[in-house]
């Protein structure tokens, strides 16, 4: 993510097909590595990025999706704080940049379809599973959590009901420490995550559908 919302990491291809066009990072799996290891390697090689959260998304296999030959792609999506990384393009990537999901350039292959499916999956999951929390600082304001959900959902939420539900889950802990006051007003309350409750909810899930 970035400050202004969800962004997608893209690389500019420096080989055919689709030379000089933007695409998702990716490549072929080596004989001695798992699919997840291939994802991690390609991200490191093409953009200098390591991943916090990795999930298999979908398998794309239309016969005409790659002009070279029949290629079946197993796609993954992950979440990182873009501010934590200085992108470094290498191997077959001429450049690597973050693009807001509402301002995407034309994409090579069927990568626009892959991005759309990833966004839809993410927005469906966050109402029943605590994903994305690793994008916040270790200590955070509740408004930071609200902003995270609104960025991921792409819309406003019912803040009062959202806070009541989140607090009832026991997922976050109110700290004695207060946030520094940057403007006139009272210092904001700081929170942290209950790591054990977080692990439990990752397994059992919850339902925020009616509150968002």
Where are these predicted regions, by residue range?
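Short helix-coil junctions and helix-kink-helix linkers
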Residues: 147-156
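N-terminal strand-loop-strand
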Residues: 1-23
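Short, well-ordered beta-strand micro-motif
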Residues: 10-12, 77-79, 192
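Active-site segment of metal-dependent pyrophosphate-handling enzymes
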Residues: 36-40, 44-90, 102-103, 123-132, ...
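Long, charge-rich, low-complexity alpha-helical segments
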Residues: 156, 164-175, 187-196
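Long, intrinsically disordered, low-complexity Ser/Thr/Pro-rich regulatory/activation regions
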Residues: 178-212
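NUDIX/MutT-family hydrolases
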Residues: 77, 87-121, 135-143, 161-174, ...
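Short histidine-centered catalytic/ligand-binding loop motif
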Residues: 24-32, 134-135
């Amino acid at each position: 993510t970035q400050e202004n919302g969800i962004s997608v990491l893209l690389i500019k291809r420096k080989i055919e097909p689709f030379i000089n066009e933007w695409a998702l990072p990716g490549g072929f799996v080596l004989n001695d590595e798992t699919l997840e290891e291939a994802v991690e390697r390609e991200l490191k090689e093409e953009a200098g990025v390591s991943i916090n959260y990795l999930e298999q998304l979908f398998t794309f296999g239309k016969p005409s999706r790659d002009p070279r030959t029949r290629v079946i792609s197993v796609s993954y999506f992950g979440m990182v704080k873009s501010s934590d990384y200085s992108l470094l393009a290498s191997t077959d990537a001429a450049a690597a940049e973050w693009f807001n999901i509402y301002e995407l350039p034309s994409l090579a292959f069927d990568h626009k379809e892959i991005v759309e499916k990833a966004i839809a999956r993410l927005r469906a999951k966050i109402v029943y599973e605590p994903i994305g929390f690793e994008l916040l600082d270790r200590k955070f304001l509740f408004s930071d959590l609200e902003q995270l959900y609104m960025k991921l959902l792409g819309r406003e939420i019912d803040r009062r009901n959202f806070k009541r539900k989140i607090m009832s889950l026991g997922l976050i802990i109110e700290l004695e420490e207060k946030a520094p006051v940057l403007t006139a007003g009272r210092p904001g309350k700081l929170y942290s995550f209950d790591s054990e409750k977080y692990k439990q909810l990752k397994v059992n899930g919850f339902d925020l559908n009616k509150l968002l």
